[in-house]
Amino acid sequence: MNANMMQQPLLISTLLTHAERHHGDQEIVSRRVEGDLHRQTYSDLAQRARRMANALAANGVCFGDRVATLAWNGYRHMELYYAVSGSGAVLHTLNPRLHPDQVVWTVSYTHLTLPTTSRV
């Protein structure tokens, strides 16, 4: 007997798949670091996250690897959030407000496979 409450595993990628399927044309609006507004739909987000996941795989990122992001909260970081976790890697977010020495220590301590950044 299957005692699970859901018919599918509760994965981060499942959240985005659901949003794309049921709310694909719904607009996501965020403010960029530069100050202007960025608009995209859930379908756009899902497509960009899949492309990024493929790029991560092409760069040697495998299931269970650790990938760090050093980025402000925004649409680029959200795309990385879904791409990294959707590819089966572990996302480690680094705070851009940390002192550079703290970032270096964190990166060396976590044994990252691939650090990624947006313009910080």
Whereabouts are the PLM-identified features?
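Conserved AMP-binding/adenylate-forming core of the ANL superfamily
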Residues: 28-82, 99-104
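Structured binding elements
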Residues: 88
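A short N-terminal helical cap/helix-turn-helix that marks the beginning
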Residues: 7-29, 47
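Short alpha-helix at the nucleotide-sugar/activated-sugar donor binding site of glycosyltransferases
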Residues: 85
